[in-house]
């Protein structure tokens, strides 16, 4: 484990993972599950990255706050994250919306979700609360972040990263002075403020916050009494704390876990089909910026029992082969060609087909003589023999969902609708 993972501030910290969001920008990928439960990287779920960061940082007291279509997420956590031991005060508590405050209230926002569980948090007597978005992909040593929070001496610390100005309107945009005080915070502004020394960049919140526990509890109480509040960290709580001059910034570079010092810091909000596709395809690089093979900082998950991947046939024009790709257990590449793609568990590709720059989720089946390029195929899809996807934008748009950057999303429901229309 990395240095600093077991310092006392970490042992006095409870981590809260906000995992209740629908993630509607991912279109039909979140039709049946919350965004943190979406598959990623060949064998993982998105939430595995933030939970692995917690465990690898020595944070073993974790609450996961869920709401939207949480069944698959809860099942994944029960199967893959039950190894922490309650008898030594380690746990992952599942905290679905239970109308704890009044019978009419589900979680009305991210801040309200934490507020409704204050009584549970107080039982553990934490000194610090680490609040984490459960839908981002990155590797971070939270112990370093918490130690920085303690050293800075402010009651609230917000982790931040630089992004291109053109992308900043999707995030909370921050202005920070030379001493790292946050002087301004705008949630998803239409016209984001650029960095003073880098006019093409903006400094944005990563959705990662550290609070002194008693301070957070008081701030949440004040927020809940404000009838005009959305009860959201980004929209309400953080701007209010910034306005009082009580929030500090923590640059991601200070705690990013990298394979080598010269590697760039990698953090992705995979909240759109384009971003989701791109982050998966990033992993096919010879040396990807996000290293899944780092034994010092493993990404933990639940992996169902499956046989090894298999590649069969070696005939001219019918050769089972994958190049610059991730191929998971249980896959069968039968006389098909795969280039720069990610195949999740149990994918089956039949003869004479080709798959390029595509992401195929578990148990997808691609028939003979198919051609796929820049496609995301949802779990359990069966692509009929001879189908071509990703080569004709107009034809693709009539049948499936085509993103702004030309990624084609294919789901079981779309294929069924197409079958019915052609019957």
From Swiss-Prot:
It catalyses: alpha-D-glucose 1-phosphate + ATP + H(+) = ADP-alpha-D-glucose + diphosphate. The keyword ATP-binding applies. Its EC number is 2.7.7.27. Homotetramer. Involved in the biosynthesis of ADP-glucose, a building block required for the elongation reactions to produce glycogen. Catalyzes the reaction between ATP and alpha-D-glucose 1-phosphate (G1P) to produce pyrophosphate and ADP-Glc. Belongs to the bacterial/plant glucose-1-phosphate adenylyltransferase family. This is Glucose-1-phosphate adenylyltransferase. It comes from Albidiferax ferrireducens (strain ATCC BAA-621 / DSM 15236 / T118) (Rhodoferax ferrireducens). The gene is glgC.
């Amino acid at each position: 484990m990395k240095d600093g993972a077991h310092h006392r501030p970490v042992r006095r910290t409870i981590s809260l993972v906000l995992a209740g969001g629908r993630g509607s920008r991912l279109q039909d990928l979140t039709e049946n599950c919350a965004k943190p439960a979406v598959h990623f990287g060949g064998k993982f779920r998105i939430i595995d990255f933030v939970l692995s960061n917690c465990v690898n940082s020595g944070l073993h007291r974790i609450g996961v706050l869920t709401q939207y279509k949480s069944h698959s997420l809860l099942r994944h956590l029960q199967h893959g994250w039950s190894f922490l031991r309650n008898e030594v005060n380690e746990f992952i508590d599942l905290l679905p919306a239970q109308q704890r405050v009044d019978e009419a209230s589900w979680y009305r926002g991210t801040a309200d979700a934490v507020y409704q569980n204050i009584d549970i948090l107080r039982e553990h007597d934490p000194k610090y609360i680490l609040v984490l978005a459960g839908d981002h992909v990155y590797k971070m040593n939270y112990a370093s972040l918490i130690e920085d929070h303690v050293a800075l001496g402010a009651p609230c610390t917000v982790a931040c990263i630089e992004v291109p100005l053109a992308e900043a309107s999707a995030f909370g945009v921050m202005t920070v002075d030379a001493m790292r005080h946050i002087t301004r915070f705008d949630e998803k502004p239409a016209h984001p403020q650029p960095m003073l020394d880098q006019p093409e960049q903006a400094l944005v919140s990563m959705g990662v916050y550290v609070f002194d526990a008693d301070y957070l509890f008081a701030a949440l109480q004040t927020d809940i009494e404000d009838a005009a509040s959305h009860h959201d960290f980004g929209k309400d709580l953080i701007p209010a704390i910034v306005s009082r001059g009580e929030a500090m910034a923590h640059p991601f570079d200070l705690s990013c876990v990298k394979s080598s010092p010269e590697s760039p810091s990698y953090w992705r909000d995979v909240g759109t089909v384009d971003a989701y596709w791109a982050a998966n395809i990033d992993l096919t690089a010879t040396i990807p910026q996000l290293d899944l093979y780092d034994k010092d900082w493993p990404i933990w998950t639940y992996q169902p029992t499956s046989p090894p991947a298999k590649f069969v046939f070696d005939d001219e024009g019918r050769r089972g082969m994958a190049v610059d790709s991730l191929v998971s257990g249980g896959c069968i590449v039968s006389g098909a060609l795969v280039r720069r793609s990610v195949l999740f568990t149990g994918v089956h590709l039949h003869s004479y087909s080709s798959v390029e720059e595509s992401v195929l989720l578990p148990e997808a089946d691609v028939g003979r003589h198919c051609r796929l390029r820049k496609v995301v195929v949802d779990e359990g899809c069966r692509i009929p023999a001879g189908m071509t996807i990703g080569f004709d934008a107009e034809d693709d748009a009539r049948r499936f969902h085509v993103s702004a950057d030309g990624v084609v999303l294919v789901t079981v429901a779309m294929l069924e609708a197409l079958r019915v229309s052609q019957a």
